[in-house]
């Protein structure tokens, strides 16, 4: 089946959803050779991935992942594609804590760094979080603390078959955009940052196909996979079963324009310190960008009805110390599992 799919892609023809499901299933089951995997993902990239193809791949990855079903009504993910090359600190990770402290349940999906100095898993470890939890423990985190971290390699074990060819190719492939689409908790709300402005509508339509209720797919026009504060941001919003695309300007919300240098991060330890300083009340451009992105998460999380209202709540959550409290609570709760895990071997 994979040979047939490769020859079709090489001719520049699109695959149907069922064809790509069959092809990716073959890869995830370990039935494809490294050469076939490399050819398949390269040919797909050259042709350009369609909404149907990305939807099909996301369905396969979701089906093969270890699932969690938190016993809460509605929860969101704040996970970007990464790979934007802007070397900012971990904005979406900071945002997850502000959203959780503001009353949104968060199932944060993430991994170690791919392109930056610090991925969400790296900075969470530097903050003191125990990320090595099984699905039952992550579910408990979401239900009891309001936030859980879904560490991708633990939940997506069948991805290991594609890891070698991906690494050896060293180019962006469909797997770079599948990560944020394959949250094993099947979150119904999402703030999803992408590295390319052409991806916002594409990804929003895929999320719609996957049954999302509300989402903002965002690309800062400075290249950031976040809502930026240096210029405008392209947003494709999923709401009421449709996709609406617009530009978001930070100055319209009373946020001062920053320079890219104002938002630079460092390694995991440095980024952890930046997040703690913001949560301890430090003002400035780094706090501003966390507030703006948190406003989007609170809006997608349905606890506020507009970005303006979200900004007010995000500021209140940080200023009152609730965001810091939520971070400390999460650190403590995730570490309470360590002794149990060690005892159970």
Swiss-Prot record:
Mg(2+) 1 binds at residues 92, 226. One of its GO terms (molecular function) is magnesium ion binding. Keywords: Amino-acid biosynthesis, Aromatic amino acid biosynthesis, Glycosyltransferase, Magnesium, Metal-binding, Transferase, Tryptophan biosynthesis. Anthranilate 1 binds at residues 80, 111. Its EC number is 2.4.2.18. Pathway: Amino-acid biosynthesis; L-tryptophan biosynthesis; L-tryptophan from chorismate: step 2/5. Anthranilate 2 binds at residue 166. It is an enzyme of class 2 (transferase). Binds 2 magnesium ions per monomer. 5-phospho-alpha-D-ribose 1-diphosphate binds at residues 80, 83-84, 88, 90-93, 108-116, 120. It comes from the Bacteria. It catalyses: N-(5-phospho-beta-D-ribosyl)anthranilate + diphosphate = 5-phospho-alpha-D-ribose 1-diphosphate + anthranilate. InterPro entries: Anthranilate_Pribosyl_Tfrase, Glycosyl_Trfase_fam3, Glycosyl_Trfase_fam3_N_dom, Glycosyl_Trfase_fam3_N_dom_sf, Nuc_phospho_transferase. It holds the Pfam family Glycos_transf_3. GO terms for biological process: L-tryptophan biosynthetic process. Mg(2+) 2 binds at residues 225-226. Catalyzes the transfer of the phosphoribosyl group of 5-phosphorylribose-1-pyrophosphate (PRPP) to anthranilate to yield N-(5'-phosphoribosyl)-anthranilate (PRA). Homodimer. NCBIfam families: trpD. Belongs to the anthranilate phosphoribosyltransferase family. This is Anthranilate phosphoribosyltransferase. The lineage of its organism: Bacteria, Bacillati, Bacillota, Clostridia, Eubacteriales. The gene is trpD.
């Amino acid at each position: 089946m994979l040979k047939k799919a490769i020859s079709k892609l090489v001719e520049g023809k699109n695959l149907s959803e069922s064809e790509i499901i069959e092809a990716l299933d073959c890869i995830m089951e370990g039935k494809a050779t490294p050469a076939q995997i490399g050819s398949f993902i390269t040919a797909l990239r050259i042709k350009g991935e369609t909404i149907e193809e990305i939807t099909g791949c996301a369905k396969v990855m979701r089906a093969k992942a270890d699932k969690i079903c938190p016993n809460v009504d509605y929860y969101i993910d704040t996970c970007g594609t990464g790979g934007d090359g802007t070397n900012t600190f971990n904005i979406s990770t900071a945002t997850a804590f502000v959203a959780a402290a503001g009353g949104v349940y968060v199932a944060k999906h993430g991994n170690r760094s791919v392109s930056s100095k610090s991925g969400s898993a790296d900075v969470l470890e530097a903050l003191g979080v125990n990320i090595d939890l099984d699905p039952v423990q992550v579910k408990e985190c979401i239900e009891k603390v309001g936030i859980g971290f879904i560490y991708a390699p633990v939940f997506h074990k069948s991805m290991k078959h594609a890891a070698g060819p991906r690494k050896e190719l060293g180019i962006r492939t469909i797997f770079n955009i599948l990560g944020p689409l394959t949250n094993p908790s099947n979150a119904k709300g999402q703030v999803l940052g992408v590295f390319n402005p052409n991806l916002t509508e594409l990804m929003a339509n895929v999320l719609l196909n996957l049954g999302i209720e509300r989402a903002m797919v965002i690309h800062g026009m400075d290249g950031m996979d976040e809502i930026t504060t240096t210029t405008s941001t392209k947003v494709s919003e999923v709401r009421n079963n449709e996709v609406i695309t617009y530009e978001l300007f930070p100055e319209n919300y009373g946020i001062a324009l920053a320079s890219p240098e104002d938002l630079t991060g460092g390694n995991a330890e440095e980024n952890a310190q930046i997040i703690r300083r913001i949560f301890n009340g430090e003002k400035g451009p780094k706090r501003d960008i966390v507030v703006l992105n948190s406003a989007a998460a609170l809006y997608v999380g349905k606890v506020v009805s507009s970005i303006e209202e979200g900004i007010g709540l995000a500021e209140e959550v940080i200023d009152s110390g609730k965001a810091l409290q939520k971070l400390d609570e999460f650190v403590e709760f995730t570490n309470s599992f360590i002794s149990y895990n060690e005892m159970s071997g």
